[in-house]
């Protein structure tokens, strides 16, 4: 069967189109790929594989330019053919939700995979493994899924006239957007609309997911990230409205925040992160909130866990802790609320439902810098930046490392170095490589060397999280943590 015929056959079977639509669909495909592909045969059988072959044939025939951007634009246009229009997607979602919220979520997740909005083939390239630590097993990923622009495209992007449409990659205006060299193609993108605390919000999946059912909840308006009482209200509303999902927010200050601070949004999904499994190492009750179980968890960052049947109690207590933290200083452990009116303190909050109760984890953050630590006092320090130098955002806070693509090759180089092969190790890894070699001087097995290097990456990630923790895992640090807790107001035994 020809490539076009087979693709159209799959579109009909995977959508609301019918056999009568075959000629129409063929012409819609040809308008995008050109008639030169009509004679191309294929032995592929999966919709996304057929789409990929159509894109490559179109490049080969020079109907589109040979660039990542052109490929993405064409690919999303082709997959838009199997994607219902936004109003239909929303209608289907809410009709299913009335009977089963879980089924509505599952159906939307399946659609987002089927139409290649979630890039399963790319995500499969990621390297993922677990490492034991004093805080339980941590998750390490080397992110290889996002395609990198070639230098020509980067140069072109610099010359493109600035556009304010869509304002950012999280705006509702991305739904169906054609794409350009400096903004991703979103023809096959769909967003579920829902009301939250009196405002319109959107629910979508992340195209390059870092974990199972990684999704984004985004403000219907382009408003900056802001942690407030409303954040706690919304996060708890999400975990109630989207059963089985956690929801968390990046912090709203530079250094300790995420990569997008210009558009308010939360992340969620169906994944148990290492932090969720962390036990309470100290418990107490806050005065006036006797029904809320509270404590400090055993975790490299500074986390208060609150659990209750009552959303209202959790919201009120979380807001009280947040307001106290924003103005709290303790010079004995280098904690400072502000400098000349510039705030340093915020929170990374995470919500979930567990055993029928609502749970909030509040991670205390401080974005001070110093002469010794110009990138951030509570940020990965210089000696671990060869592994991770980017901000420690929500996902890393919860114990999942997202490491840059360069590490795939660099980890292998260090492993080769350990077994005595003549390889060049990156300058910034040399000290680390020498340290590992001195610890394992007689290594000859490459596989064993690779395992040692990967475990060491995990140990360094623990250090990264400890650097980001405002109260250190020392007697002095934990005593200071309790001083803050007492400042909020706890019941004394």
Curated annotation (Swiss-Prot):
Pathway: Carbohydrate metabolism; galactose metabolism. It catalyses: alpha-D-galactose 1-phosphate + UDP-alpha-D-glucose = alpha-D-glucose 1-phosphate + UDP-alpha-D-galactose. It is found in: Cytoplasm. Keywords: Carbohydrate metabolism, Cytoplasm, Galactose metabolism, Nucleotidyltransferase, Transferase. Its EC number is 2.7.7.12. It is an enzyme of class 2 (transferase). GO terms for molecular function: UDP-glucose:hexose-1-phosphate uridylyltransferase activity. GO terms for cellular component: cytoplasm. GO terms for biological process: galactose metabolic process. The keyword Glycosyltransferase does not apply. InterPro entries: GalP_uridyl_Trfase_II, GalP_uridyl_Trfase_II_CS, GalP_Utransf_C, GalP_Utransf_N. Belongs to the galactose-1-phosphate uridylyltransferase type 2 family. This is Galactose-1-phosphate uridylyltransferase 2. It comes from Streptococcus pneumoniae (strain ATCC BAA-255 / R6). The lineage of its organism: Bacteria, Bacillati, Bacillota, Bacilli, Lactobacillales.
């Amino acid at each position: 069967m020809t490539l076009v015929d087979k693709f159209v056959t799959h579109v009909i079977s995977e959508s609301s189109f019918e056999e009568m639509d075959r000629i129409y669909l063929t012409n819609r495909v040809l308008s995008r790929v050109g008639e030169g592909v009509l004679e191309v045969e294929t032995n592929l059988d999966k919709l996304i594989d057929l789409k990929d072959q159509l894109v490559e044939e179109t490049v080969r025939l020079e109907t589109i330019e040979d660039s990542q951007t052109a490929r993405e634009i064409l690919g999303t246009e082709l997959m838009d053919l199997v994607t219902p229009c936004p109003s239909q997607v929303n209608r289907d979602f809410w009709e299913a939700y009335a009977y089963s919220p879980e089924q509505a979520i599952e159906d939307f997740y399946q659609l987002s995979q089927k139409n290649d909005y979630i890039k399963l083939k790319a995500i499969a390239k990621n390297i993922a493994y677990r490492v034991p630590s004093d805080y339980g097993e941590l998750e390490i990923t080397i992110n290889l899924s996002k395609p990198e622009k070639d230098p020509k495209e980067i140069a072109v992007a610099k010359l493109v006239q600035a556009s304010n449409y869509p304002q950012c990659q999280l705006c509702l205006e991305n739904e169906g957007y054609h794409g350009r060299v400096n903004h991703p193609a979103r023809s096959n993108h769909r967003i579920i609309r829902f009301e939250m605390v009196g405002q319109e919000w959107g629910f979508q999946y992340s195209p390059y997911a870092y974990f199972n059912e990684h999704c984004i909840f985004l403000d219907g308006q382009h408003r900056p990230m802001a942690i407030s009482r409303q954040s706690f209200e919304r996060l708890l509303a999400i975990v109630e409205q989207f059963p089985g999902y956690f929801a968390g927010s990046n912090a709203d200050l530079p250094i300790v925040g995420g990569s997008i601070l210009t558009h308010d949004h939360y992340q969620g999904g169906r994944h148990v992160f290492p932090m969720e499994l962390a036990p309470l190492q100290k418990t107490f009750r806050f005065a006036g909130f006797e029904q809320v179980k509270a404590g400090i968890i055993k975790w490299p960052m500074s986390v208060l866990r609150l659990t209750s049947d009552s959303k209202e109690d959790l919201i009120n207590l979380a807001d009280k802790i947040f307001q106290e933290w924003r103005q709290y200083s303790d010079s004995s452990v280098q904690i400072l609320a502000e400098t000349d009116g510039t705030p340093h303190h915020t929170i990374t909050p995470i919500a979930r439902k567990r055993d029928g109760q609502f749970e909030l984890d509040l991670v205390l953050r401080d974005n001070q810098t110093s002469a010794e630590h110009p990138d951030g006092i509570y940020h990965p320090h210089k000696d671990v930046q060869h592994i991770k130098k980017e901000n420690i955002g929500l996902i890393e806070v919860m114990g999942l490392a997202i490491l840059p693509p360069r590490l795939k090759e660099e980890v292998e180089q260090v492993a080769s170095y350990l077994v005595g092969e003549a390889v060049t190790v990156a300058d910034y890894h040399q000290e680390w490589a020498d340290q590992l070699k001195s610890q394992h001087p007689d290594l000859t097995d490459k596989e064993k060397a690779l395992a040692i290097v990967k475990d060491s990456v995990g140990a360094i990630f623990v250090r990264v999280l400890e650097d980001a923790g405002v109260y250190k895992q020392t007697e002095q640090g934990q005593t200071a943590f309790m001083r803050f807790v007492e400042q909020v107001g706890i019941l004394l035994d």
